[in-house]
Swiss-Prot record:
Family label: Belongs to the arsA ATPase family.
Molecular functions (GO terms): ATP binding; ATP hydrolysis activity; ATPase-coupled arsenite transmembrane transporter activity
Alphabetical keyword list: Arsenical resistance, ATP-binding, Nucleotide-binding, Plasmid, Translocase
Disulfide-bonded cysteines: none
Source species, domain of life: Bacteria
Ranges in coiled-coil conformation: none
Known function: Anion-transporting ATPase. Catalyzes the extrusion of the oxyanions arsenite, antimonite and arsenate. Maintenance of a low intracellular concentration of oxyanion produces resistance to the toxic agents.
Reactions it catalyzes: arsenite(in) + ATP + H2O = arsenite(out) + ADP + phosphate + H(+)
EC numbers: 7.3.2.7
Enzyme class, first EC level, given as a word: translocase
Source organism (scientific name): Acidiphilium multivorum (strain DSM 11245 / JCM 8867 / NBRC 100883 / AIU 301)
Family matches, as InterPro entries: Anion-transp_ATPase-like_dom, Ars_ATPase, ATPase_ArsA/GET3, P-loop_NTPase
Protein name, per record: Arsenical pump-driving ATPase
Residues the entry annotates as binding ATP: 15-22, 334-341
Length: 583
């Protein structure tokens, strides 16, 4: 494999959720450890599952992976990092300043952007700790899905320039002291990321057009900010031998080969490896060792036709239940890459076909909704909350209102404050709350961003709710977006997942997070299931067999109601293909 040749000290894996970054980064770490290298595997993903892959509680201190001599691992927990970050700033001023001032500073440091910057603080510490490179030959980062990774990797430049030019900033991060000390570290982190002798970036993708387009955007964006040493790994490719068995396998193989032959510009020039689809899920050291191994394409697997025949678990049945309320907010949540965009579009089309007025909207940074829905339908409105546009609109609004009575120095200070990366979080949230107000009169179907973003969005919603409640006190009736999200008569949250171990685990974790926020998911959609797709391919049958325990777990342990959606022979783009998902 090209990926495994002349590996520099730092290796980053990035890509959409569900493409196999964790599996490949873990397999690479095992490979290097078996070559006698000392390896540290670091996860900075809010939806981290490295511990689950190795069946080991890892946590945020370096610990050896007992099953693999030479390998150690570390997980950065963003929430814990934020707590420690707050304590570092707030503890020294307790008792020195009035309680209300201390509480105000603590509150300023409780938002989503603090969590992100705190996790990044730890990330920077690892990149700039010279002693780590005396203990380890390689440090491998299993980073978060694409949108989050881009923001994470853009932060060092954004924050170091912001701190440089804004020593007295009124940023929502509160006092800049917590960052001021690390200014040099941020600069060194940027330097390390941009140095091809020290850092290699591995883009991980599956052979699906939307995934490849997203990876191409990531490639361009990261190359622009200096990360030019990039490799591409295409994971989960169906072996040609499987295409002989039936129409579905042949269609999947054909579709993947066409995608491989027509890689987006930029990707085709990168050093590229392809990994074949595995018959088992990548959990445990022995399975991971097989992932990078060279082997024959033809798998001697038993030919059994697995067809899951449960009671009515169709997507159309789920939508018919939703339609009874005649209006409301439908939010699809889940990890990136599970098909939220497609499911949201299919649900919106079904409701519009039933005669309802529907507004379909997305805040997904990848924004491939327009690709999925290329055709128009009466009584269906499609819109996108564009993070860049919303941020600009928000900045202008703040400058025109808060900035109206400021002198020139004050205006300059406010402008600088609005250049803080956390401004985008606030702007996107405001746009989101504008859209959900419409749900009293029609159906609003919202395709939310991948897991990490979704949790940040909900955190912002909760902070807004607390602010309104504080201002209103006990007087009067009021409704905040958070109250609407918590009301099952007005909001139906659907969790979308895939019938695989890790996606189900992550969706269950997301459900637990939602329930802590007082939101109980109305149902689950299990997408891309082979177990209800009629196939005689030995490999696909083996994969279908692997799905059954996961489907049963969702049904019996997690969900009030579920829908099962099969793998289709062609990608569901366009209205007719979306209608097929309902049959």
């Amino acid at each position: 494999m090209k990926l495994l040749q002349n590996i520099p000290p730092y290796l980053f894996f990035t890509g959409k959720g569900g493409v196999g970054k964790t599996s490949i980064s873990c397999a690479t770490a095992i490979h290097l450890a078996e070559q006698g290298k000392r390896v540290l595997l670091v996860s900075t993903d809010p939806a981290s599952n490295v511990g689950q892959v190795f069946d080991l509680a890892i946590g945020n201190t370096i610990r050896p992976v007992t099953a693999v001599p030479g390998l150690s691992a570390l997980e950065i927990d963003p929430q814990e990092a934020a707590r420690q970050y707050r304590a570092r700033i707030v503890d020294p001023i307790k008792g020195l300043l009035p309680d209300d001032v201390v509480n105000s500073i603590s509150e300023q440091l409780s938002g989503a952007c603090t969590t992100e910057i705190a996790a990044f603080d730890e990330f920077t510490g690892l990149l700039t700790d010279a002693s780590l490179l005396t203990r380890f030959d390689h440090i491998i980062f299993d980073t978060a899905p694409t949108g989050h990774t881009i923001r994470l990797l853009q932060l060092p430049g954004a924050w170091s320039s912001f701190i440089e030019s804004n020593p007295d900033g009124a940023s929502c991060l509160g006092p800049m002291a917590g960052l001021e000390k690390q200014r040099e570290q941020y600069a060194h982190a940027v330097e390390a990321l941009s140095d091809p002798e020290r850092t290699r970036l591995v883009l991980v993708a599956r052979l699906q057009n939307s995934t490849l387009q997203e990876v191409a955007r990531t490639h361009e964006e990261l190359a622009e900010i200096g990360l030019k040493n990039q490799y591409l790994v295409i994971n989960g490719v169906l072996p040609e031998a499987e295409a002989e068995h039936d129409a579905l396998a042949a269609a999947i193989w054909q579709r993947e080969q066409e995608a491989l032959a027509n890689l987006p510009a930029g990707l085709s020039e990168l050093p590229t490896d392809t990994l074949l689809l595995q018959p088992v899920n990548m959990v445990g050291v022995s399975a991971l060792k097989g992932l990078l191994a060279t082997r024959s394409e033809a798998l001697p697997l038993p030919v059994t036709n697995i067809l899951y025949t449960p009671e009515n678990l169709s997507l159309s049945g789920l939508v018919d239940d939703i339609a009874r309320s005649e209006h409301g907010l439908i939010m699809l949540m889940g990890k990136g890459g599970v098909g939220k965009t497609t499911m949201a579009a299919a649900i919106a089309v079904r409701l519009a076909d039933m005669g309802f007025d529907v507004h379909l909207t997305t805040s997904d940074p990848a924004a491939h909704l327009s690709t999925t829905l290329n055709g128009s339908l009466k009584n269906l409105q499609v819109s996108r909350i564009n993070p860049h546009d919303e941020t600009e609109r928000y900045r202008q609004h703040v400058l025109e209102t808060k900035g109206r009575d400021l002198d020139e120095a004050g205006k300059r200070l406010l402008e600088e404050d609005l250049r803080s990366p956390c401004t985008e979080e606030i702007a996107v949230f405001q746009a989101f709350s504008r859209v959900i107000r419409e749900a009293g009169k029609r159906f609003v179907v919202m395709d939310t961003a991948p897991t990490g973003h979704t949790l940040l969005l909900l955190d912002a919603t909760g902070a807004y709710h607390r602010e309104i409640a504080k201002k209103m006190g006990s007087k009067g009736h009021f409704t905040t977006p958070m109250m609407q999200l918590q009301d099952p008569d007005r909001t139906k949250v659907l969790l979308v997942t895939l019938p695989e171990t890790t996606p189900v685990l992550e969706a269950a974790n997301l459900q637990a997070d939602l329930e802590r926020a007082g939101i109980h998911p109305w149902g689950w959609i299990i997408n891309n299931s082979l177990s209800i797709a009629d196939t005689r391919s030995p490999l696909l049958c083996q994969r279908a067999q692997q799905e059954l325990p996961q489907i049963e777990a969702v049904k019996n342990q997690h969900a009030d109601r579920i829908a099962l959606v099969p793998v289709l022979a062609s990608e569901p783009a366009g209205i007719e293909k979306l209608r097929e998902l309902m049959s």
